[in-house]
Amino acid sequence: MKFIVKLFPEIMMKSKPVRMRFTKMLETNIRNVLKKVDESAKVQRQWDKIMVMVPDDRPDLVEAFGERLACIPGIAHVLQVNVSTFTSVDDIYQQTLVAYKEQLVGKTFCVRVKRAGKHDFNSIEVERYVGGGLNQFTEAAGVRLKNPDMTVHLEIDNDNLYLIDKRIEGLGGFPMATQEDVLSLISGGFDSGVSSYQFIKRGSRTHYCFFNLGGDQHEIGVKQVAYHLWQKYGESHKVKFISVPFDPVVQEILERIDNGQMGVILKRMMMRAATRVAQKMGIQALVTGEAMGQVSSQTLTNLNVIDRCTEQLILRPLIAMDKQDIINLSRQIGTEDFAKSIPEYCGVISQKPTVKAVLSKVEAEEAKFSEDLLDRVIADAEIIDIREIATQMDTKITETETVDSINANEIIIDVRAPEEEEKSPLKIDGVEVKAIPFYKLATQFADLDKDKSYLLYCDRGVMSKLQALYLQEQGYTNVKVYRP
């Protein structure tokens, strides 16, 4: 059994040196991926295709090889074939009859032949001869050249006959590492996962930069998304995962920045931090999952203001895509379930965000930041090889107890941002409620009465749980999540 790997058409259109470079890289990528499945994998490059050989004594590898080949960038489609030699056109027919006789019962069919090499016949002659024989000596319903029930595909390469057993659609795009590296800003949601995939498919080694706003549980969820994308579509090359602790930035934004400017300024700070990471890694472009008009910070005016904070190239592959199309693609690539479980943070967005930010006003607000703010968060950033995530996933995160009722000796802590808490304060008869924003809780919790139990509350129950997990990691056992 063999696989014939067909190159993506855009590769075929390249000049001879570029096409050769792309094909060599694809051969290497295929070998790197399949060797992880089984060391016996053999890959052979030819001018217009790549051959993958499956050992005769290992039929169990056929399905696994096919699945991996379907996810390697640069492949148009893969043909799963049985290989034999032939002596004449009639010999081709006889072999085809044996292979397809049972499959053709009651079906209309046509025969399609591709041929390479010197022969005393052409492709059409083979199609007519084989098709006529199959029509006469099988129980097929007849020949139909347009829209048949079944197409018999044959390929002839010199004296080799390839009986095509199965066609597997490929990923398309360019082979990994034929384009320059990019740094993708990943949050774990629908958009950033799909935008990362788009650049993997286009041949860029895609590294991941995550801005951590709320603890280990969120980070682990995002790492799972990044690891899935790398393992399924980009495993042929090593990439990095960078985690930047961004809660100090969020804290200063919430304490010092005008409410309407928060969203744009948060994005600008992320771009600045990502630029520093990218420059440190020698990467020239950032990738984001922003789509025009999807949220308030993604108007063209705001995107323009965001881009002014850096000279780094910012690429937005989803800029004109509809949200449903993005979700559909996330389902196709396997990130939808991850995205559904990734939290959206309450209290990190403006109550009345501007849709037409003015650069001068934004810069005036940014002057309120501590001078060393970005230096501090970049210094604390963690850079790991993405392969290390697999072992980190085995780390067990303590489950936080969630309650819907309040007992004696329990105090509720409202961890929402001040604007949200003031807009709809939490009031429960006979129960003490303390308002401590999530970004201050870590530093103020130690000052609270240790003989009391504390129930953390926020609208969505996400930030409260993450803060509870964080406090538990610090050794506090008197904390739960309150979800009425």
Curated annotation (Swiss-Prot):
Residues where ATP binds: 185-186, 267, 289, 298
Keyword field contains Transferase: yes
Keyword Transferase part of the UniProt annotation: yes
Keyword field: ATP-binding, Cytoplasm, Disulfide bond, Nucleotide-binding, Redox-active center, RNA-binding, Thiamine biosynthesis, Transferase, tRNA-binding
Annotated EC: 2.8.1.4
Matches recorded under SMART domains: THUMP
Pfam families reported for this sequence: Rhodanese, ThiI, ThiI_fer, THUMP
Function: Catalyzes the ATP-dependent transfer of a sulfur to tRNA to produce 4-thiouridine in position 8 of tRNAs, which functions as a near-UV photosensor. Also catalyzes the transfer of sulfur to the sulfur carrier protein ThiS, forming ThiS-thiocarboxylate. This is a step in the synthesis of thiazole, in the thiamine biosynthesis pathway. The sulfur is donated as persulfide by IscS.
Domain annotation THUMP: ranges: 63-167
GO cellular component: cytosol
Molecular functions per Gene Ontology: ATP binding; CCA tRNA nucleotidyltransferase activity; tRNA binding; tRNA-uracil-4 sulfurtransferase activity
Active site residues of this protein: 458
Entry-linked InterPro entries: Rhodanese-like_dom, Rhodanese-like_dom_sf, Rossmann-like_a/b/a_fold, ThiI_AANH, ThiI_fer, ThiI_N, THII_Thiazole_biosynth_dom, THUMP_dom
Major site of localization recorded for this protein: cytoplasm
Catalytic activity as recorded in UniProt: [ThiI sulfur-carrier protein]-S-sulfanyl-L-cysteine + a uridine in tRNA + 2 reduced [2Fe-2S]-[ferredoxin] + ATP + H(+) = [ThiI sulfur-carrier protein]-L-cysteine + a 4-thiouridine in tRNA + 2 oxidized [2Fe-2S]-[ferredoxin] + AMP + diphosphate; [ThiS sulfur-carrier protein]-C-terminal Gly-Gly-AMP + S-sulfanyl-L-cysteinyl-[cysteine desulfurase] + AH2 = [ThiS sulfur-carrier protein]-C-terminal-Gly-aminoethanethioate + L-cysteinyl-[cysteine desulfurase] + A + AMP + 2 H(+)
Subcellular location: Cytoplasm
Pathway per the UniProt entry: Cofactor biosynthesis; thiamine diphosphate biosynthesis
Family annotation (PROSITE patterns): RHODANESE_3, THUMP
Record-stated family: Belongs to the ThiI family.
Domain Rhodanese: 406-484
Protein name per UniProt: tRNA sulfurtransferase
Cysteines engaged in disulfide bonds, as pairs: 346-458
GO terms for biological process, alphabetical: thiamine biosynthetic process; thiamine diphosphate biosynthetic process; thiazole biosynthetic process; tRNA 4-thiouridine biosynthesis
